[in-house]
């Protein structure tokens, strides 16, 4: 009988996302990216390591993983509210042209900009009135994903490293994890505030079943 996965399982999964017209906009597979002309040298095309239920990828897709069989391919269609949200007219905002002049930007329809930490796309330009759309570019669209869970990760060290890689955006080869019985010591190349490492330690204990997780900066004594 095929193995099924559940919430809090760590898995390696390949997936490809498509729009209703078949256009590929997201994939973990290099061949699919090249065939769809969206290949980027900056991307690392390999199976994504995901902890089910932690919303490390699109939440609507994450929900689909629970209860699925390892090695079996699935197709799911996500409505806008489970994908990138419905289009919200309130997210269409008028931005004064002076804001663009201050940053020496020439606003043109289709230009993507960051205003106060919000990503938006210039919709129209008319005199001193520039309308910027702060909806996600795929908001309001139904999307389809094809995915396959390749394997379930059982090694505790691999779970620790993969979760911290995703959460802290630190390369996996820069994260050291030592596991002895029911305790783990994590060595990071950056010294994070105690509040952050304490929060991460609690989360890792919850996800891995360890009794204790300690953090230390590289070259420091264990604390």
Cite the ranges covered by each PLM segment.
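FKBP-type peptidyl-prolyl cis-trans isomerases
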Residues: 1-223
